[in-house]
Regions:
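Non-heme iron-sulfur electron-transfer modules
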Residues: 2-14, 38-74, 95-121, 409-419
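Short, intrinsically disordered, charge-biased short linear motifs at domain edges
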Residues: 10-23, 67-70, 76-79, 227-231, ...
Length: 429
C-alpha cells in the first residue's frame, strides 16, 4: 500500500487539549443518536471537533482568518443551536456531556450588560413571571379577537421585522397562569406534601383550545386533594426558581444562587425533609436533585404518582389513544418506563413515538429557533397522527407547547390525565 515503512507513525490526527469537560472524546460519534441538532446544524461530536480545531489554531497561531471564521460560525451552529439537554452523555462511552460544555462557553461569552440583566431578572422574578403571564393573556385576548390565521400572519411579520427577536406565536401558545396561594390546603389531611409549582407553571397556563382550561397548579392540587394530602407551599414562592433558566444560558453563579434560595425554602416547608417535595416540571426537578441536599425527598409528577398516590386513588382507564413525550430529564432520570406505565393506567392505548429523544424546544429555543423544535419532532408527527391520539401528555410545559404545535393535538401535563382517570380510593382511607 505504501513504500514508507514508518507511515504508521506519521500524520496522526491532532487532538489538542481543549477543555477537561471534552478532552476524553475519541470522536466515535456514539453521541449523535441522541443529539437533537444532529443533521440540523452540528452534532455533539462535531462541536467538539470544531472546538479542537479552534484550540489548535490558537495554540499554533496558524491561519488567523480561518480561526476567526470558525469562531464566528460556531456561535450559531455550535452554541445557539445546542439544546444543552445532556442526552449525548447517555450514549457516550466516557459520559461526556457536550451540552454542559456549551453552557460553559455561553457563560464565557456573556457581556457585563447580560450579567446585569440576568441578576435583575433573578432579583425580580415575582414581577417577571407576573408580567409574562399578563403578556400571554393579552396575546390570548388578541387571538380571540382576530382569529388564528390573522394572528399567525401578524406574528410572522413581527418576527421578520424584528430579525427573529420576537418569539414565534402558534395556536399552541399558552394563556397566562398564576401561582396558588401559600396557605396550607387541606391541613387535616392524613398525609402531607410540599408542592412547588415551577416558575413556568406559575406563568404558563393551558392553550386557548386545550380541552381543560385549569392550570397545572390547579390540576395538581386537585389530584393531591383526592388522594387525601395536606398541601404545603414554600414561603415567598413567587420569587423562587430552581435556577435552570440561568444555567441553560450560562449564568452559573445566578443559577446556583436561585437553587440555594429554593433549597432553603423547601427545607423549611418540609421540616428538614420530613415531607416529600413535588415539583410539577421534570427539568426543574432534575436540576434540584443534582444540586440540592439529600435531606430533601424530591419528586417529579410521574414518580410521585407511582410512589405515593396509587394506594389512595382509584384508576379507571379511558377508552382513548394518547401520546406521551418523555422529556430529556425524564430520560436522564430513568423514568420513561414509569411515564408509560402511569399513562397506561389512565388510557387504553399509549403511544410513545420511537426515535424521538429531545423535542428541540430546549427552554426557549422553540420560541426563538423553532426549526430546531421542528427537526426534533420530525419523526413523531406521523406516528402520533396515524395512531389517532386525541391528546398528548408529558411533564414540561414548554416541551408540551412544541409537541402540540407540530402534532396538531393538545399536549398537557401527565397530571391532567391522572386527574381525569382517578377518584378517591375510599377503601384505603
Amino acid at each position: 500500500i505504501n513504500d514508507d515503512p514508518k507511515c504508521h507513525l506519521k500524520h496522526f490526527k491532532q487532538l489538542p487539549a481543549c477543555d477537561p469537560l471534552i478532552d476524553k472524546c475519541i470522536e466515535c460519534g456514539f453521541c449523535e443518536v441522541n443529539c437533537v441538532s444532529n443533521q440540523f446544524s452540528l452534532s455533539a461530536r462535531q462541536r467538539i471537533v470544531v472546538q479542537r480545531e479552534i484550540a489548535r489554531l490558537k495554540q499554533t497561531g496558524q491561519d488567523p482568518a480561518r480561526l476567526a471564521e470558525l469562531e464566528k460560525d460556531f456561535l450559531s451552529l455550535g452554541e445557539e443551536s445546542c439544546a444543552g439537554d445532556g442526552l449525548c452523555a447517555l450514549s457516550c462511552p466516557v459520559g461526556i456531556d457536550t451540552g454542559k460544555y456549551i453552557k460553559q462557553l455561553r457563560g464565557d461569552h456573556l457581556s457585563a450588560k447580560a450579567q446585569k440583566t440576568g441578576n435583575w431578572v433573578a432579583d425580580h422574578l415575582s414581577g417577571v413571571t407576573t408580567a409574562a403571564a399578563v403578556s400571554l393573556n393579552v396575546v390570548n385576548g388578541i387571538h380571540s379577537l382576530v382569529g388564528t390565521k390573522a394572528l399567525e400572519r401578524m406574528s410572522t411579520t413581527a418576527r421578520s421585522l424584528s430579525k427573529d427577536r420576537i418569539p414565534r406565536w402558534t395556536p399552541a401558545m399558552p394563556k397566562g397562569a398564576s401561582a396558588p396561594g401559600e396557605t396550607e390546603i387541606n391541613p387535616d389531611g392524613p398525609r402531607k406534601v410540599v408542592y412547588f409549582p415551577s416558575c413556568i407553571a406559575r406563568s404558563m397556563g393551558p392553550a386557548k383550545n386545550d380541552p381543560v382550561q385549569d392550570s397545572i397548579s390547579a390540576v395538581t392540587i386537585r389530584v393531591l386533594q383526592k388522594a387525601g394530602y395536606g398541601i404545603l407551599f414554600p414561603a415567598e414562592m413567587k420569587k423562587l426558581c430552581c435556577g435552570t433558566p440561568w444555567e441553560s444560558k450560562g449564568f452559573a453563579e445566578i443559577a446556583d444562587r436561585k437553587s440555594a434560595e429554593l433549597e432553603k425554602a423547601l427545607l423549611a416547608a418540609s421540616e428538614q425533609g420530613k415531607y416529600p417535595v413535588l415539583c410539577d416540571t421534570s427539568p426543574c426537578l432534575y436540576r434540584m436533585r443534582n444540586v440540592m441536599t439529600e435531606k430533601l425527598k424530591l419528586y417529579e409528577p410521574v414518580e410521585f404518582v407511582h410512589e405515593f398516590l396509587l394506594d389512595h386513588l382509584s384508576f379507571t382507564r379511558k377508552n382513548v389513544t394518547v401520546a406521551i413525550h418523555a422529556t430529556c430529564s425524564t430520560q436522564k432520570l430513568g423514568l420513561t418506563g414509569l411515564l408509560k406505565k402511569v399513562a397506561g393506567m389512565c388510557a387504553e392505548k399509549v403511544i410513545l413515538p420511537p426515535d424521538v429523544n429531545c423535542c428541540g424546544f430546549a427552554g426557549d429555543k422553540g420560541f426563538n429557533l423553532p426549526k430546531l423544535n421542528e427537526h426534533g419532532l420530525r419523526k413523531a408527527v406521523s406516528v402520533v397522527q396515524q395512531a389517532g391520539a386525541v391528546a398528548g401528555y408529558s411533564n414540561s410545559r414548554t416541551c408540551e407547547i412544541g409537541c402540540a404545535t407540530y402534532t396538531g393535538i393538545p399536549y398537557m401535563s401527565i397530571m391532567y390525565l391522572v386527574d381525569e382517570a382517578t377518584q378517591p380510593r375510599i377503601d384505603k382511607e
